Curated annotation (Swiss-Prot):
Comp. bias intervals (Pro residues): 193-205
GO molecular function, one term: RNA binding
Taxonomic source organism: Aspergillus niger (strain ATCC MYA-4892 / CBS 513.88 / FGSC A1513)
Protein name: mRNA cap guanine-N(7) methyltransferase
Superkingdom classification of source: Eukaryota
Source lineage: Eukaryota, Fungi, Dikarya, Ascomycota, Pezizomycotina
């Protein structure tokens, strides 16, 4: 039967006992009193009990202690408080500090004695009194036994305590991986018998060669053993290539500079001098009439509604300002570009004179007001025009031509209605790069449906003269053409770029370099930039076709191109020979595509599609 204490607390009494196998204190329940049948065995002497059990069995020692505990008896409720005061206190487990101290002393005695007998003495009843004394001292500091019983020591805590012991001894605790893979590691670490390597084949004796030359440090060692003549030849080739590149670049810069310097040096003689004292006044008048014819025929658009935006590539001194003022469709903006700075200054002065001589609105009495003019010094063929401020404001398309966006080049475009270049594009055929840059500027400035008009030398006439005459030079007292080198025997210029000749024109052009413009090559290039040929005729054909026009015929008389009474041209035979060298530029029907020997200059017109 359970005692009253058990009924009151709900727990059985227990006692703290030291377990050397686990190296800790454990709580053991107090064994209740046995019936009379078992009393004989309980009343056995301690000597007999100690002889029957092993020395290391701590359970026997603790059991012998429990035998001396008083037997539980039934107590009346009135006597219960008094009985509880007389009952001895239940021993509680010592604190962790006391445990550690007691454990160290006990284990130290055990190892000092070197035998299990010393440890048995520590576990004897004589030592239990010391144990109970420690328990009594620390009973007030420890929690009740029933709470200690509820928190068993986990496996992880036991491992941590074991690792702490190993660390105190200076040993590293084993990791979980080493414990898990102990057998595998040992198996891998076991030496394995290796098969002997096959013997190496005997080396053949090296043939006797000359002793290797010692290399001195420096560039000679890095170059290797090369013949000095080879090194000298390579150096000469490199120097020759550098000289050719430098000469080519200087020539390219030199041509542009020569042309710029020449036109900057041409004096401004005035309109009266050109009409009365000039030796080539008839030729000048004829060339101006052909340019006016191009402007009158091809500058207006189909709608003929809004005012035109015009850009002139190679405007010179502004000689065409008056022609654009008389255009059939009024001009709103004229932009003049030229590489010669002095020519741009003179063009500004001419434009300022036009404004001051035509009233406050800048136009003649009864005529249209003078357009707004902008002038800039710019290489129109070797540089991109997109960095010119006024061109940016009007609009320029950078995606035209090969390599650009197809949609942008097809549907995009610039803001100008007309691009004009009179007696200038032959300077762009110095190289293919310049020719393409010129066409990129033209196509980029033009809007869809815009016109590109101009005048250039007729390559068909030049080819015919080169094929007929062995000496590539011809002219008279008015003009002269001379090729500095050999010319093609068949008259076909291949490649189509860089065929330079020097051209001289009395009172107009000094001995400056120009370049042949092979017409078919030029036309093929224009197609890559969405320019379609509409008109092309030599100068003399333009005269024969337009001299009887109701507007252009009287204009030729006013400009002094033909006599009012006879109707004949006022040019001398030498001037007519000079004018047959060029043809006005304008792309048109197939009949006018081939020059028939009637003009050294020809005119053209392209449409932007």
């Amino acid at each position: 039967m359970a005692s009253k204490e058990e009924e009151r607390t709900g727990q059985r009494p227990s006692i703290s006992m030291y377990d050397p196998a686990r190296d800790r204190w454990e709580e053991q329940p107090v064994v209740p009193a046995e019936p009379a049948s078992a009393s004989a065995s309980i009343e056995a002497t301690p000597t007999q009990t100690s002889e029957a059990k092993p020395v290391h069995d701590s359970t026997v020692t603790s059991t012998s202690e429990s035998l001396h505990l008083p037997q539980t008896t039934t107590i009346e409720p009135s006597q219960q408080p008094e009985q509880q005061q007389k009952q001895p206190p239940i021993p509680t487990p010592p604190s962790s500090q006391s445990r550690r101290k007691h454990k160290i002393n006990k284990m130290g005695d055990y190892y000092r004695s070197g035998s299990a007998d010393a440890y048995a003495e520590q576990s004897s009843p004589a030592a239990d009194s010391h144990k109970r004394k420690l328990e009594d001292e620390t009973s007030e500091q420890q929690p009740p036994a029933d709470q200690a019983n509820d928190r068993p020591i986990s496996k992880r805590k036991r491992l941590e305590e074991r690792h702490q012991k190993l660390r105190k001894r200076g040993q590293a605790p084993p990791s979980a991986y080493s414990r898990r893979d102990g057998d595998e590691t040992a198996a891998r670490a076991a030496p394995r018998p290796r098969s002997p390597s096959p013997p190496l084949p005997p080396r053949s004796p090296s043939p006797e060669v000359q002793a290797r030359q010692r290399k001195r440090p420096g560039g000679g060692a890095r170059r290797g053993l090369v013949d000095p003549q080879t090194l000298r030849r390579r150096q000469e080739e490199r120097e020759r290539a550098l000289e050719e590149d430098a000469m080519r670049n200087s020539q390219s810069r030199g041509v542009t500079d020569i042309v710029r310097q020449h036109y900057n040096a041409v004096p401004q003689r005035g309109r009266e001098w050109r009409k009365t004292e000039s030796k080539i006044k008839g030729l000048r008048s004829f060339n101006n009439w052909v340019k006016s014819t191009l402007i009158q025929k091809f500058s207006p658009d189909e709608e003929f509604e809004k005012r035109l935006l015009v850009i002139d590539l190679g405007c010179g001194k502004g000689g065409d300002l008056g022609k654009w003022q008389l255009a059939p469709q009024p001009v709103d903006l004229y932009v003049g570009l030229d590489p010669a700075e002095v020519s741009i200054i003179q063009a500004r002065e001419r434009y300022a004179g036009m404004r001051s001589g035509r009233g406050p609105r800048g136009g003649r009495r009864g005529g249209p007001p003078l357009f707004h003019g902008e002038f800039r010094s710019k290489d129109c063929f070797g540089e991109w025009l997109g960095d010119v401020d006024i061109v940016q404001q009007v609009g320029i398309d950078p995606n035209v031509g090969p390599g650009g966006s197809m949609m942008a080049s097809r549907w995009g475009g610039g803001g100008f209605d007309v691009v004009t270049s009179m007696f200038a594009i032959h300077y762009a055929f110095e190289s293919e790069e310049k020719a393409r840059q010129m066409l990129r500027n033209v196509a980029g400035c033009l809007k869809k449906g815009g016109r590109f008009i101009g005048v250039c030398p007729n390559s068909d006439i030049i080819s015919a003269r080169v094929e007929e005459e062995a000496k590539a030079e011809w002219g008279n007292s008015i003009y002269r053409v001379r090729f500095p080198g050999d010319t093609p025997e068949d008259g076909i210029f291949r490649p189509p770029f860089g065929w330079k000749y020097s051209y001289f024109m009395e009172e107009a052009v000094g001995e400056i370099p120009e370049y042949v413009v092979p017409w078919e090559a030029f036309r093929a290039l224009t197609e890559e930039y969405n320019l379609e040929l509409q008109y092309r005729k030599p100068f003399m054909e333009v005269w024969r076709d337009e001299k009887d026009d109701p507007e252009l015929g009287p204009l030729s008389e006013r400009m002094g191109v033909r006599d009012r009474t006879t109707g004949e041209l006022t040019m001398t035979p030498e001037e007519q020979e000079a004018v047959s060298k060029y043809t006005p530029l304008g792309f048109t029907s197939a009949e006018g595509e081939s020059a028939n020997g009637t003009g050294f200059y020809h005119a053209f017109c392209f449409y932007k599609v």
